[in-house]
Every structure is written in structure tokens, then in C-alpha cells.
């Protein structure tokens, strides 16, 4: 089993580059199934295990997928007749596999998709996806662990109001509606930058989508879509993690590819704490020194504070003075990393959906295990400043969302190694 071992205490300095966004590339790869004319080539694709998983799903659906890791590119040719079924073998590994349902319904009028797997954070229900497909005219039923969808009369544009701004449901409905007859309105839509990237990609393919990044998205269905070349946006969560790495070590680093507008809620909190940020055209420079000020954070759908940055921000807050409260409103069960932080001598108490952090914790190196993708990064961040050695296991979580994080931190001056036991 792999582990990452960190000896804390080094300030990070230098420059580091952000990869393409995991949460953008997965839906965009599935959207490539919509192109019945010409293959699509995606560039700035991160070399992640989740990308390999979704590529395997696309292959089972009869798409030809060529993964050019050395170029950070994937070519998807979905011009042949697609298979209707995404089997449990692959879908069970990752929740994003549910995103093939929208494109399959759009292209074939029917689909069978196994109920998904992925991170064990909360229930992450798929009711909003199903509600959207039914509104577009599909009949849905669940049987033997599979979702069966059939639109025998084709998908027809409609108005859909989401109960909450679900990112996955917004993406799935956009993809299904892009080839539906007529106009579809999605109200209370998710507004994440990854939604905008998906809409831009489909528009480049010949789609007619407006309003992405706002509460209301309009999709005018078209007859067909064609393959194009598209560059994936930088990963705002990786960028945020690296900014915090600079701040937590009281270092000075330049994060190339970090985009302020994609992470405004995070950078404003960092500035509130006394972290110095210099916004440049091609990235953000982060500098910090001395004591940081206490702030409270509350996770919310975009443009609020991202739940995917909650555990990393908690690591930074452990190094700040005063009383801090972290409130999680997006997912239940997203404080599983607290028990691991406590093994490192963190002073945290969880009360319901809030975690209370008292004073500056004198973090100590310990053996800890990652409980999910972002917790893995947060424990590594804590290890950068802990006294002594920290060993982080369960790195399969980390590999789902970060490319060579330990290598990037080492390049910036961290004393860190990945060891295969």
C-alpha cells in the first residue's frame, strides 16, 4: 500500500502549475458522446484515475477512446452506434458515471445505467437527475440496481426547476436537452465554472445554450452535434489547495493557472486571514508570514465557499489564532477528516454540521488515513507544518483528484516522499 510521508517545517517557495479541472473534464468527456459527426479532442486533460474510469465507461458504450497521456489529451470518437448500457463494473467506481445517461438518452432515446459509486460523502441523491429526465419526456424505473430510461417519443424541451442547484443534475439535463426538440429552461441551476465549461464545449459542437453560470440556463435543442477540439479549464480546487499550501507554510509561491474569478469565495477568506495574494494574468502569487487571523467559513453552492475546499481550509485554520467555526451545509458526513486531524493534536470539536476550532493547534506528526479525496490533500497540508513525520495512507482517494501532488510540493521545497510499502 502506498503512503506519503512528510517531515513538517519547510516554507514552500517557487512556482507550480495547475492541471485541467477534474470536475470539468468528466462531464465534458461524457458530452463527447453527443457528437455523431467527427471525433472530439480534449486537451489539458489531467492524468487522474477518474479520467481512466470514465474512459472505460465510454469504451463499453462503443466509443473509441484514445488517451494520449504524454500530451494530456483524449480523443473520443462516438460516431458509431452507441451501446445503451453502462455496467456496474465501471459505474460503481465513480459517481460521475451517471453523467452518461443524459447523452445516451439524447442520442439513442433509451439508456440503462447502474446506480453509481464514488466518494462516501453523504447520500448525494440522484433524484434531481431523474426529475429532469422525466420532465423531458423519459420514463424512468429502477430495477436490480440499474436505472432504466426510455423516451420512446423522443425528448421534448420543457421548464425544469431544480429543488437545489445540483451540479450533476444540471450537467445531465443540459446534455440531454441539447438534442431535444424545442427549448428547455433549467431554473435554480448550478452556477459552477465547470458548468460554464461544459456549455461552452457543447456550443462549440453546434449546440445552443445560454445562461450558463447563472440561475437560469436555456437550451435550444439542435438536430445533431459534431466533434471539436476543446481545452479544459484549470482546476480551481487544486489551485486552492496549492494556495493554502503556500499560506500554511508561511511561504511564497506562484500558482500558475489559478483564476481569481473561479475561486472568489476562497481568496477573499484567505485575504481576511491576512494572507497576501497578488492576482496576475496567468495565476496568483500567495505569501504569508506570522500569525493569521481567525475566520469562520460556511460551505454553500457556488459562488459560495466550496465544500471541496472545506477540509483544506480547516487545515489552514488550525494554524490561525482565536476561535473559528467551519459549517458544512452541502454534504453530510464531511467531517470524517476531523478524527484524523485529532490524531495530529488538533483542537477541534464537532457539533452537528459545525466544527469548532479553538486557538492555534500545535500539530504533531502522526499516522493518518485519507477518508476521501479532499481529506487526503488536507492531511498532507497539515503534515507540511506538523512537528515531526506524518504518514498518510489510503492514497487511492488522492489519485482520483490530484496529479502528482507530492511531487509538486517537493518541487516547492517540502520534505515529502511517496513510498510503496
From Swiss-Prot:
Pfam families in the record: EPSP_synthase (PF00275)
Active-site positions on this chain: 119 (proton donor)
Keywords: Cell cycle, Cell division, Cell shape, Cell wall biogenesis/degradation, Cytoplasm, Peptidoglycan synthesis, Pyruvate, Transferase
Catalyzed reactions per annotation: phosphoenolpyruvate + UDP-N-acetyl-alpha-D-glucosamine = UDP-N-acetyl-3-O-(1-carboxyvinyl)-alpha-D-glucosamine + phosphate
Gene3D superfamilies from the UniProt entry: Enolpyruvate transferase domain (3.65.10.10)
UniProt main location, coarse: cytoplasm
Xref: SUPFAM superfamilies: EPT/RTPC-like
MF terms (GO), sorted A to Z: UDP-N-acetylglucosamine 1-carboxyvinyltransferase activity
GO biological process, one term: cell division
Keyword Kinase: no
Residues that coordinate or bind phosphoenolpyruvate: 22-23
Biological or metabolic pathway of the protein: Cell wall biogenesis; peptidoglycan biosynthesis
Record-listed 2-(S-cysteinyl)pyruvic acid O-phosphothioketal modification sites: 119
Superkingdom, taxonomy of origin: Bacteria
EC assignment: 2.5.1.7
InterPro entries (UniProt xref): Enolpyruvate_Tfrase_dom, Enolpyruvate_Tfrase_sf, MurA_subfamily, RNA3'P_cycl/enolpyr_Trfase_a/b, UDP_GlcNAc_COvinyl_MurA
Described function: Cell wall formation. Adds enolpyruvyl to UDP-N-acetylglucosamine.
Family: Belongs to the EPSP synthase family. MurA subfamily.
Name by which UniProt lists this protein: UDP-N-acetylglucosamine 1-carboxyvinyltransferase 1
Source species of the chain: Staphylococcus aureus (strain bovine RF122 / ET3-1)
Amino acid at each position: 500500500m502506498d503512503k506519503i510521508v512528510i517531515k513538517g517545517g519547510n516554507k514552500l517557495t517557487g512556482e507550480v502549475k495547475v492541471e485541467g479541472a477534474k470536475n470539468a473534464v468528466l462531464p465534458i468527456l461524457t458530452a463527447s458522446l453527443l457528437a455523431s459527426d467527427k471525433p472530439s479532442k480534449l486537451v489539458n486533460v489531467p492524468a487522474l484515475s477518474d479520467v481512466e474510469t470514465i474512459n472505460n465507461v465510454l469504451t463499453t458504450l462503443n466509443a473509441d477512446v484514445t488517451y494520449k497521456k504524454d500530451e494530456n489529451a483524449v480523443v473520443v470518437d462516438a460516431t458509431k452506434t452507441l451501446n445503451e448500457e453502462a455496467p456496474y463494473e465501471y459505474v460503481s467506481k465513480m459517481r460521475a458515471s451517471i453523467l452518461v445517461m443524459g447523452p445516451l438518452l439524447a442520442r439513442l432515446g433509451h439508456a440503462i445505467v447502474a446506480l453509481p459509486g464514488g466518494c462516501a460523502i453523504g447520500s448525494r441523491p440522484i433524484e434531481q437527475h431523474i426529475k429532469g429526465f422525466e420532465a423531458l419526456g423519459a420514463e424512468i424505473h429502477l430495477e436490480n440496481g440499474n436505472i432504466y430510461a426510455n423516451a420512446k417519443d423522443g425528448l421534448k424541451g420543457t421548464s425544469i426547476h431544480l429543488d437545489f442547484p445540483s451540479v450533476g443534475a444540471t450537467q445531465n439535463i443540459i446534455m440531454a436537452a441539447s438534442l431535444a426538440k424545442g427549448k428547455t429552461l433549467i431554473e435554480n441551476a448550478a452556477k459552477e465554472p465547470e458548468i460554464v465549461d461544459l456549455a461552452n464545449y457543447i456550443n462549440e459542437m453546434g449546440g445552443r445554450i445560454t445562461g450558463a453560470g447563472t440561475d437560469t440556463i436555456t437550451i435550444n435543442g439542435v438536430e445533431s452535434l459534431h466533434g471539436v477540439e476543446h481545452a479544459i479549464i484549470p482546476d480551481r480546487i487544486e489551485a486552492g489547495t496549492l494556495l493554502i499550501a503556500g499560506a500554511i507554510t508561511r511561504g511564497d509561491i506562484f500558482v500558475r493557472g489559478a483564476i481569481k474569478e473561479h475561486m472568489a469565495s476562497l481568496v477573499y477568506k484567505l485575504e481576511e486571514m491576512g494572507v497576501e495574494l497578488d492576482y496576475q494574468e496567468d495565476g496568483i502569487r500567495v505569501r504569508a508570514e506570522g500569525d493569521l487571523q481567525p475566520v469562520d467559513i460556511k460551505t454553500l453552492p457556488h459562488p459560495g465557499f466550496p465544500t471541496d475546499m472545506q477540509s483544506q481550509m480547516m487545515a489552514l485554520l488550525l494554524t490561525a489564532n482565536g476561535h473559528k467555526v467551519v459549517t458544512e451545509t452541502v454534504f453530510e458526513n464531511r467531517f470524517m477528516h476531523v478524527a484524523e486531524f485529532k490524531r495530529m493534536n488538533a483542537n477541534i470539536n464537532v457539533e452537528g454540521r459545525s466544527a469548532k476550532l479553538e486557538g492555534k493547534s500545535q500539530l504533531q506528526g502522526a499516522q493518518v488515513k485519507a477518508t476521501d479525496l479532499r481529506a487526503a490533500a488536507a492531511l498532507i497540508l497539515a503534515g507540511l507544518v506538523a512537528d515531526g513525520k506524518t504518514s498518510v495512507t489510503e492514497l487511492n482517494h488522492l489519485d482520483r483528484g490530484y496529479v502528482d501532488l507530492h511531487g509538486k510540493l517537493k518541487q516547492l521545497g517540502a520534505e515529502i516522499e511517496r513510498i510503496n510499502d
